[in-house]
């Protein structure tokens, strides 16, 4: 009969219950020792499996499963299952527990009890796990501890189970090299060498290399490059997730942590614990009045019995650690700052070999330098060196993916060959003379494609063979790790063979392969990671076009002012200034810590201020909606300032971010339009000062948003009454311009005006400008009609008629749009509904001589260009 819960540990009780379930599953009427053994050894993390691994024993699962399968079945399945005479081995288990002085029956007692069954004992002996060997392994695992807790089995070798030996990883060469950070490493070692309070805590922003410092200390311990007090110590990284996982019962988490701490305390050589994200121990495991992890650590930390390296971010240190003064006092802070671009380049150069070996590609030094520079300039919401390393890693992954796919030239030819072969098969079935002639031509085409394809495939295979061999040789450079291990272990013969024979041969072969690849001028396979690959990754992440300009982009930028002129009529000065600013930015010559450009557009309503901003967005992003538009008439109250940067803490909407900061934070390359800026409350302008000067703004959550890649435009109607003079000349325009600027200076404060790159005054639209506006408006109507298959054509006299009846000098171009919508677009809509417009037809709008009303004529099958 199985023991009650109070007589067994949780693991033992679970094993006995699972053995009963195993017997029921196999339709056995009783529980055999083989059922219990199978359950124990199936649990890979259980004590029984750990004993077998410690003994390097063979597998026992298959013979045990065969033994269970050979047991007699009972049909129908029995309702109750009992233990066989030796299935529970209950008397022996109780006797074994009493013999060693244990309060509860544990899994190790079950394991020893299995040897009372002759069949199970034979299986264990065949796997080289005799009873004596198992008892010895259990004694070594228990280390003299008595079974007094229901969770006892989980506490055997707790340090190995709930922590990772960083020194072991360093010995095996599995840790990345730590470049630089000498001051922080030495400061940490000095704190560890103290008598009391020898617990450093690494504090820094996420991604600056806190964990790398702990790994660097592990590598120094392995090399012996540490003070005598740290020689032969081991550095373990505590896995809090493994400690907490599965600890559903009260007290289970505390038992696990106490067993880890006791092993650390009792270790002969000394153990240093590294706890990443140490703020998590504050409150970890706390529930229903039980202690949290921090309170278990505090006494040992204070007495110097436990040496711990913690790591956390500045924000989490302030939020969690500083609130627990007793916990904070037991640690000495070591601040880890973000490395400079030069230091980051050194770090990347040190890691380059690892990434080359992993991805099987070559990384140029230019790519390393550009990765650090672009990461520093454009990826502003993360920290070095983490963001630069990620850039290199993703660029390598992209090149590796391209290496794994066939070149486009070969792919096109192979598809063409398959199509021709399918056509040839179809033609072979056709007996007509024309088909036979066509078949000859198709076979000739297949022959020609094969002749073109064969050398390409041969060249591709040769290049892939070299690259695959290069990757294999780079991975074999792990022999350097064996060299370091041989030197540490004093195996000088092996070290000499590796240093003067094996490693030089590998390096010579790598050098030879790289030279062969370099000599090939036109390659089908690109295995190098260049600065262009890194820039492409930055462009994908941020939307900022930092990749090298293609010929199309060059022509587009050089002709930018011409494209803008087509859309914005009569504002030559404004267009030229905006185009010049964009060219400076795309050439990489804009100031690094300020917006790409900042303008104040002044002028009367309807002259093209907002239209020019839309045109810039359309030219840069192919979509005029791709801009952040802030209508300043919505910010007339003083309290509305918070909407730009986000509501303060404690207010509704704090987590949603600001209407200005959030779009720019997510899409840092954008056009930001502050429309009708004079209508906002004066306090709103204070928010803009830092944006215009330093290209940065801190939102309500303390995050710095980078505006250095934005074009900022403010529009205003201030002083527009001075520009409505119909008799304007170039000389009078300068006077009028000064009057407008005087009005602006009297309204806006000097600190705002002084931060703008340029103040552009838009001219009043002249008659010839308005003709171009009419053309643009009709082009917009034709764009809307394109999907219906219609187009509109205006006679010359119609434009004058529209200007005469639709133009208002004080209102600019907007009245023209309203007039065209009312008198032309409405008539087109009426004709469409009445089905008076056949498909693919042109609607000609004309004005009869002496007439006062437009007429509409329809021509089918002609475009507006073909209609004379």
From Swiss-Prot:
The source's domain of life comes to: Eukaryota
Where do the record's region annotations for I lie? 159-407
Q: Which CDD domains match?
A: AAA, RecA-like_ClpB_Hsp104-like
Q: Which GO terms describe its biological process?
A: cellular response to heat
Q: Which residues bind ATP?
A: 204-211, 603-610
InterPro entries documented for this protein: AAA+_ATPase, ATPase_AAA_core, Clp_ATPase_C, Clp_N_dom_sf, Clp_R_dom, ClpA/B, ClpA/B_CS1, ClpA/B_CS2
The protein's UniProt keywords, in alphabetical order, are:
ATP-binding, Chaperone, Nucleotide-binding, Repeat
Domain Clp R: where?
Answer: 4-144
GO function term, MF aspect, one: ATP hydrolysis activity
Region labeled II — which residues? 529-720
Region Repeat 2, as annotated, extends over: 83-144
Gene3D superfamilies, from UniProt? Answer: 1.10.8.60, Clp, N-terminal domain, P-loop containing nucleotide triphosphate hydrolases
Where does the record place the region Repeat 1? 8-75
Any one GO CC term of this protein is: cytoplasm
Family to which this protein belongs: Belongs to the ClpA/ClpB family.
Q: What is this protein called?
A: Heat shock protein 100
Q: From what organism does this protein derive?
A: Trypanosoma brucei brucei
């Amino acid at each position: 009969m199985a023991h009650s819960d109070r007589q067994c540990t949780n693991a033992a009780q679970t094993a006995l219950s699972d053995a009963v379930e195993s017997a029921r599953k196999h339709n056995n009427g009783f529980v055999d020792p083989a059922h219990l053994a199978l359950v124990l050894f199936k649990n890979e993390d259980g004590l029984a499996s750990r004993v077998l691994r410690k003994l390097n024993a063979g597998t026992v699962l298959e013979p045990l499963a065969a033994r269970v399968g050979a047991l007699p079945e009972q049909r129908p399945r029995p309702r109750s299952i009992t233990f066989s005479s030796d299935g529970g081995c209950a008397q022996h288990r109780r006797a074994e527990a009493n013999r060693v002085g244990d309060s509860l029956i544990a899994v190790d007692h079950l394991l020893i009890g299995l040897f009372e069954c002759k069949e199970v004992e034979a299986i264990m002996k065949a796997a080289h796990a005799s009873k004596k060997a198992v008892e010895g392994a259990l004694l070594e695992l228990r280390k003299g501890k008595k079974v007094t807790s229901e969770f006892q089995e989980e506490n055997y070798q707790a340090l190995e189970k709930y922590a990772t030996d960083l020194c072991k990883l360093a010995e095996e060469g599995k840790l990345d090299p730590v470049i630089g950070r000498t001051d922080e490493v030495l400061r940490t070692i000095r704190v560890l060498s103290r008598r009391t309070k020898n617990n450093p805590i690494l504090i820094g922003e996420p991604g600056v290399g806190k964990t790398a410092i702990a790994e660097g200390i592990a590598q120094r311990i392995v090399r012996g490059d540490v003070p005598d007090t740290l020689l032969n110590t081991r550095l373990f990284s505590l896995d809090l997730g493994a400690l907490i996982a599965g600890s559903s019962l009260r007290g289970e988490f505390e038992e696990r942590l106490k067993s880890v701490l006791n092993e650390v305390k009792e270790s002969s050589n000394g153990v240093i614990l590294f706890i990443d994200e140490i703020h998590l121990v504050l409150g970890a495991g706390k529930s229903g009045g039980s202690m949290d992890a921090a309170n278990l650590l505090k006494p040992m930390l204070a007495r110097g019995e436990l040496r711990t390296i913690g790591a956390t971010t500045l924000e989490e240190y302030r939020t969690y650690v500083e609130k627990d003064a007793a916990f904070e006092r037991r640690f000495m802070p070591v601040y880890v700052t973000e490395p400079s671009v030069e230091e980051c380049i050194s770090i990347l150069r040190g890691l380059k070999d690892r990434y080359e070996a992993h991805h099987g590609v070559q990384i140029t030094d230019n790519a390393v330098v550009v990765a650090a520079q672009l990461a520093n300039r454009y990826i502003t919401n993360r920290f070095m060196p983490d963001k630069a390393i990620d850039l290199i890693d993703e660029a390598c992954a992209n090149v590796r993916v391209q290496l794994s796919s066939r070149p486009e030239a070969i792919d096109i030819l192979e598809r063409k060959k398959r199509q021709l072969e399918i056509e040839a098969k179809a033609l072979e079935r056709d007996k007509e003379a024309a088909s036979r002639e066509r078949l000859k031509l198709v076979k000739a085409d297949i022959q020609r494609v094969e002749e073109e394809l064969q050398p390409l495939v041969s060249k591709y295979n040769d290049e892939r063979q070299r690259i695959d061999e290069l990757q294999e040789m780079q991975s074999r450079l792990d022999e350097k790790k064996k060299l370091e291990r041989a030197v540490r272990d004093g195996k000088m013969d092996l070290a000499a063979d590796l240093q003067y024979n094996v490693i030089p041969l590998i390096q010579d072969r790598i050098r030879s392969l790289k030279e062969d690849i370099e000599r090939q001028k036109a390659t089908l396979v690109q295995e190098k990671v260049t600065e262009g690959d890194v820039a492409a990754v930055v462009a994908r992440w941020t939307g900022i076009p930092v990749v090298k300009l293609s010929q199309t982009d060059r022509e587009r930028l050089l002709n930018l002012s011409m494209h803008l002129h087509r859309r914005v009529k009569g504002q030559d000065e404004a267009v030229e200034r905006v185009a010049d600013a964009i060219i400076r930015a795309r050439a990489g010559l804009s100031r690094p810590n300020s917006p790409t450009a900042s303008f104040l557009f002044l002028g009367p309503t309807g002259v093209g201020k907002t239209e020019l901003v839309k045109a810039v967005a359309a030219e840069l992003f192919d979509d005029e909606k791709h801009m952040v538009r802030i209508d300043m008439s919505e910010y007339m109250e003083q309290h509305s300032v918070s909407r730009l940067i986000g509501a303060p803490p404690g207010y509704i909407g704090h987590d949603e971010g600001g209407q200005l900061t959030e779009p720019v934070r997510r899409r840092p390359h954008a056009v930001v339009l502050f429309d009708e800026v004079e209508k906002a409350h004066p306090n709103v302008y204070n928010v803009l000062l830092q944006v215009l000067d330093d290209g940065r703004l801190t939102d309500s959550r303390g995050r710095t948003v980078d505006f250095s890649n934005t074009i900022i435009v403010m529009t205003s109607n201030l002083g527009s009454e001075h520009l409505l003079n119909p008799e304007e000349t170039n000389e009078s325009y300068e006077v009028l311009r000064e009057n407008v600027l005087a009005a602006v200076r009297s309204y806006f404060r000097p600190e705002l005006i002084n931060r703008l790159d340029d103040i552009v005054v838009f001219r009043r639209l002249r008659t010839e400008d308005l003709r171009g506006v009419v053309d643009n408006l009709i082009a917009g109507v034709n764009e809307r009609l394109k999907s219906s298959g219609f187009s509109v054509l205006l006679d010359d006299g119609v434009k004058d008629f529209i200007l005469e009846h639709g133009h208002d000098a004080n209102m600019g171009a907007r009245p023209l749009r309203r007039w065209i919508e009312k008198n032309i677009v409405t008539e087109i809509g009426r004709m469409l509904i009445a089905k008076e417009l056949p498909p693919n037809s042109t609607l000609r709008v004309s004005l009869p001589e002496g007439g006062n009303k437009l007429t509409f004529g329809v021509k089918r099958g002609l475009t507006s260009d073909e209609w004379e």
